[in-house]
């Protein structure tokens, strides 16, 4: 059996994950990437999306990450995220309301509405919902 890699996910406010993982899959800025123990060292930016990993027992875990950076070393993956939430922390109704609000702002294109900001809010809401729906 292959050895595990250590995964650490931290935000400015908290340590979200700090445990052994069999594999880590993350939303890199150039596309999703997977990491096993012994991977070549690299550093990449992350986009908004789902960070998935199998814990040491083989159970698949999913987090929402709101951008950031990942440092991959042969024995460790460190994710520095702007924000990160476990599936259990995501409030479905709050996310649906945020999605509806962003869609409304984008469709209205009112004066004074920052469309890029509304589009970013919509992307975050869609990704959070996808984390909730992932089995």
From Swiss-Prot:
This is ATP synthase epsilon chain. InterPro entries: ATP_F1_dsu/esu_C_sf (IPR036794), ATP_synth_F1_dsu/esu (IPR001469), ATP_synth_F1_dsu/esu_N (IPR020546), ATP_synth_F1_esu_C (IPR020547), ATPsynth_dsu/esu_N (IPR036771). It comes from Desulforapulum autotrophicum (strain ATCC 43914 / DSM 3382 / VKM B-1955 / HRM2) (Desulfobacterium autotrophicum). Keywords: ATP synthesis, Cell inner membrane, Cell membrane, CF(1), Hydrogen ion transport, Ion transport, Membrane, Transport. Produces ATP from ADP in the presence of a proton gradient across the membrane. It is found in: Cell inner membrane. GO terms for molecular function: ATP binding; proton-transporting ATP synthase activity, rotational mechanism. Coiled coil: none annotated. It is a peripheral membrane protein. GO terms for cellular component: plasma membrane; proton-transporting ATP synthase complex.
């Amino acid at each position: 059996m292959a050895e595990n890699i250590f995964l650490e996910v931290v935000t400015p406010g908290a340590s979200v994950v700090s445990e052994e993982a069999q594999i880590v899959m993350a939303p890199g800025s150039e596309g999703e990437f997977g990491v096993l123990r012994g991977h070549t060292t690299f550093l990449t930016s992350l986009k908004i999306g789902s960070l998935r990993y199998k814990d040491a027992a083989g159970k698949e875990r999913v987090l929402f990450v709101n951008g950031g950076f990942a440092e991959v070393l042969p024995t460790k993956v460190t994710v520095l995220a702007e924000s990160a939430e476990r599936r259990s922390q995501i409030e479905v109704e709050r996310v649906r309301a945020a999605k509806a609000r962003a869609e409304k702002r984008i469709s209205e294109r009112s004066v004074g509405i920052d469309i890029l900001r509304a589009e970013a809010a919509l992307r975050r809401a869609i990704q959070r919902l996808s984390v909730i729906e992932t089995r």
